[in-house]
Design a protein with these regions (language model features):
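Residue-level micro-sites within transmembrane alpha helices that shape
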Residues: 7, 21, 165, 169-171
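Bacterial N-terminal signal peptides that target proteins for export
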Residues: 2-12
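Bacterial N-terminal signal peptides
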Residues: 11-22
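N-terminal, motif-rich segments that launch catalysis or mediate targeting to/interaction with membranes
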Residues: 23-159, 163, 179-261, 268-271, ...
Length: 345
């Protein structure tokens, strides 16, 4: 199966999940799929938003990094969604995308340690996985990217940079910071995909993504936690404004139909989406901008911490056909596991 066919299948698979699967929390810590006809859930930030965030982050980088990142901009854009592809096939991937801050009675640094080792000493790895790992995953992936820069490993730089952009973007989504991640606890099922997929697709073309130049991050762990707490601070507005607008408009005017990939699908109506987006007063734009800036900052920081290798020189290196084959085989293995994975309750 070539890469184009693979990507088409993954797209159809994910939309199948959206239309026919409700994502619920299995007993040992991941949000996994359980078939439940007629209930929908979108992938994180949506493919569109994740890809745009990685692409736009490139333009925050300094001139020294630009030859390499501009050359590989298509790779970084296309592969921004790899973690979402893996989350259905790779054990342990799903918790890396979120953290349920409301699962902890106290989120102070003393009670909820900011470093993973300290947190596992306090709660154990299973509890942490149950409630999500995204701030710790950002820290880990940051160190991995720094090492890839240090080794001047082109393939690893690209793969890890794309993944890091994904996790950072997820950390900036309010609904990735709560157990009520899809409104399922408040009768607002579907709000996850509405906020992070439908709204960006409809309105992000008008957003201002001039976020300034990438800056060095002195404390990656502190920055990761600032992101999730900042996103969580917006959660009340996300839920309350949707609930209030639904009460005013009514369920019958809340939804409409749209054509996607030749299928007629139920979506949030354009008028409802516009009014909700207006009430949020730029919230989605702010979170996307924060994601773009943070991704650029972390890429830049990894490069600096690795000793600022010559990226113009690395840009001249061609990726070998063997490396392409290995990557293609890896993605095919994700596909095989999609069919062999059992359902988990």
């Amino acid at each position: 199966m070539n890469r184009q066919m693979y990507n088409r299948f993954i797209w159809l698979f994910v939309w199948g999940v959206i239309f026919f699967v409700e994502t619920v929390r299995p007993s040992y810590g991941t949000r996994g799929p359980v078939c439940r006809p007629g209930v929908a859930r979108q992938p994180q930030w949506g493919f569109y938003a994740h890809q745009q965030i990685n692409r736009l982050a490139i333009f925050t980088l300094p001139a020294e990094m630009m030859p390499f990142f501009k050359k590989h901009s298509q790779y970084l854009t296309d592969n921004a969604v790899n973690p979402d592809k893996r989350r259905y096939a790779v054990v342990g991937e799903a918790p890396r995308h979120f953290i349920d801050l409301d699962a902890y009675p106290d989120t102070s640094a003393v009670t909820l340690p900011r470093f993973y080792k300290d947190a596992t000493d306090r709660y154990g790895p299973d509890t942490l996985a149950l409630h999500g790992l995204v701030p710790w995953q950002i820290q880990l992936t940051k160190y991995q990217l720094t090492e890839a820069f240090r080794q001047q490993n082109v393939r690893q730089i690209l793969r890890i940079a794309a993944d890091l952009g994904h996790y950072i973007a997820d950390a900036n989504v309010p609904l990735h910071t709560t157990r009520n991640y899809n409104g399922q606890l408040t009768g607002q099922q579907g709000i996850h995909g509405f906020w992070e997929s439908r709204l960006p697709e409809l309105f992000s073309k008008d957003y201002d993504f001039l976020v300034g130049s990438a800056e060095y991050v002195p404390s990656p762990q502190r920055r990761a936690w600032q992101a999730v707490f900042g996103a969580n601070a917006a959660l009340d507005s996300v839920l309350r404004m949707e609930r209030d607008l639904t009460g005013e408009i009514g369920e019958t005017r809340k939804f409409g139909f749209d054509e996607r990939n030749g299928l007629t699908t139920k979506v949030y109506a354009s008028d409802f989406s516009q009014r909700y987006h207006d009430r949020l007063s730029g919230q989605v734009e702010r979170q996307m901008r924060a994601s773009v800036k943070m991704v650029g900052d972390f890429w830049f920081t990894c490069w600096v911490d690795a000793g600022q290798p010559d990226m113009a020189k690395l840009a001249k290196r061609a990726l070998s056909s063997d490396e392409d084959l290995v990557e293609a085989e890896e993605q095919k293995s994700w596909l095989k596991r999609l069919f062999s994975a059992r359902e988990e309750n």
